Regions:
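Flexible "cap/lid" subdomain of the alpha/beta-hydrolase fold that forms the substrate-access gate
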Residues: 1-16, 20-218, 222
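Catalytic active-site module of serine/aspartate enzymes centered on a nucleophile-bearing elbow/loop
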Residues: 217-248
Length: 248
């Protein structure tokens, strides 16, 4: 991303990052501060867990390497409880293992589950067709599912989405030093900084609560709802918040 930024020679940028946009982009801002004039983030964060107990690390690693089969239902159940107490790594590891083990990852279905209103029956039948390898023939496939499956001609192209969750630093890894440098940068950040979150996304709710400590200069906007992918489900509301922030 830094090479892309430098190659295009962008400047006077207002940055907004969500999900991986924040995990990657917030560090990019810290590495090129003179190119950015304002920063906003939502449903994302900069995970930094240097003091994670060794027993938690061991349990996560054992689980990832185990032969346990994680279903879409059990994975979703664990993620929905990630902000209910306990170490978040012990919940997030279900998402990591589910993605890594899913040779034909149901990217369209997972997106549909979070981005559009569908009956449980419709979702269940779509998942059944996906599991059997007949998703292209499913009468339950929505246009959104088709759109999010379109970039992948066959399951062999899905290795990127399958692997990316294991790169989220929920336990100490090779990114620890870079995360620490970014956090040191934001602790002294003086340019306008806005946090705008859904507030009903269990995965990132804990990250929202850390922003005042992470960026003392930050201003928090009231939650706008919409779940994890609120840039899709609350597009107009989020766009309005960001446009107002840019025009201030």
């Amino acid at each position: 991303m830094s090479q892309w930024l430098e190659k295009n020679n962008f400047s006077d940028i207002t940055f907004f990052g969500q999900d991986w946009g924040g995990l990657i982009g917030l560090r990019m801002v810290a590495e090129h501060p003179d190119r950015f004039i304002k920063v906003a983030m939502g449903n994302t964060g900069l995970p930094y867990n240097p003091d994670t107990p060794q027993e938690i690390i061991d349990e996560v690693q054992r689980f990832r390497q185990s032969k346990i089969k994680v279903s879409l239902i059990s994975m979703t159940k664990q993620l929905m409880q990630i902000d209910k107490g306990g170490h978040p790594a012990l919940k997030f590891m279900y998402w990591q293992k589910f993605c890594w083990d899913a040779e034909n990852m149901a990217i369209g279905l997972i997106s549909s589950q979070m981005m559009e209103k569908r009956s449980k029956f419709s979702l269940a039948m779509q998942y059944l067709f996906q599991t059997l390898g007949f998703e292209r023939f499913s009468p339950f496939t929505s246009e959104l599912v088709k759109a999010y499956e379109a970039p992948f001609p066959d399951p062999s192209y899905k290795m990127g989405p399958r692997a990316m969750p294991t790169q989220v630093p929920i336990i100490p890894d090779a990114s620890l030093e870079a995360q620490a440098r970014a956090l040191e940068f934001y602790a002294k950040f003086e340019k306008p900084f806005l946090g705008v979150f859904a507030g009903n996304d269990p995965v990132t709710n804990p990250m929202k609560d850390l922003i005042p400590k992470m960026v003392p200069n930050a201003r928090m906007h009231p939650d706008i709802g919409g779940g994890h992918f609120f840039q899709w489900t609350r597009a107009r509301e989020l766009a309005s918040v960001l446009v107002n922030f840019m025009e201030e």
